[in-house]
């Protein structure tokens, strides 16, 4: 069953402002910070991150986000990457069209028992993820991720 969705004029204007090409803070390389700010207004989150991931080389080949944070414990990330269903889903499935959440793969109890959560995301204060992927070449993906701490899912 399809649930009807209503969109207000305010929401449409907010979405339109995201795709506007009139950004004074265009950095040349990467995305303007104002774009991240607009996305965070449309999809409330604690952090937004845009990065390139090379699963074959176990490397992040570019990255930016708000707030600007370090990469965390990348050894822990790569240790648990292939066992983490939401993290490795694009590589395992080849599906780069779906927008996914942790809750698409695990219950909260299951997620909190994973190595990825315990060793990588919990120390950063995050419980929830929303991920959009684009192809980045063989073994590579470009990811836009939204993170939230404890509380409501996306």
Model feature map: region roles:
Residues 4-153:
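Regulatory input/activation interfaces that engage signals or partners
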